[in-house]
């Protein structure tokens, strides 16, 4: 029997490492790379290249930073999860999740509340737990991934 298909919303390769590893146990994982919040096309490209070092199962949402006017993290998270759910519906995925909870700087409770408010097809997570963030650092170094030192968001 085949695994359910899950679309994982990601913004960088390092954050996706542990998420893909853990989710792949129960799901057929495809990554959705979305980076409208990123401050430049160059940063978008560097992060996308890093993700391809992890997996080739990637859907790339085109970069549209020119319309970016988000003022806080909660709104950014909401937009990226709404966008992911649109892809889920359009492409027939069973579930969706996000790798954002890998970061020690992100509030997993808030992220999961937002995801659950969008759809019951959202799979909650806190990938930083059980040394997830530490493991993501190790894996990204092994894969020689670009590791950014900021979320990429430029507030207006």
Model-derived regions: residue spans:
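Nucleotide-activated chemistry modules centered on ATP-dependent adenylation/adenylyltransferase
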Residues: 1-156
């Amino acid at each position: 029997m085949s695994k359910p298909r899950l679309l994982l919303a990601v913004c960088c390769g390092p954050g996706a490492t542990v998420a893909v590893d853990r989710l792949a146990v129960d799901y057929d994982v495809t990554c959705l790379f979305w980076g409208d919040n990123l401050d430049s096309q160059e940063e978008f490209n560097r992060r996308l290249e890093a993700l391809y070092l992890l997996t080739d199962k990637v859907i790339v949402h085109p970069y549209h930073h020119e319309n970016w006017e988000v003022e806080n993290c909660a709104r950014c998270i909401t937009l990226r999860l709404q966008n992911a759910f649109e892809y889920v519906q359009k492409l027939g995925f069973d579930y969706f999740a996000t790798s954002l909870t890998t970061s020690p700087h992100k509030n997993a409770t808030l992220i999961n509340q937002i995801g659950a408010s969008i759809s019951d097809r959202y799979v909650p997570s806190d990938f930083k737990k059980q040394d997830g963030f530490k493991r993501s650092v190790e894996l990204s170094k092994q894969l020689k991934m670009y590791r950014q030192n900021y979320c990429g968001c430029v507030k207006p």
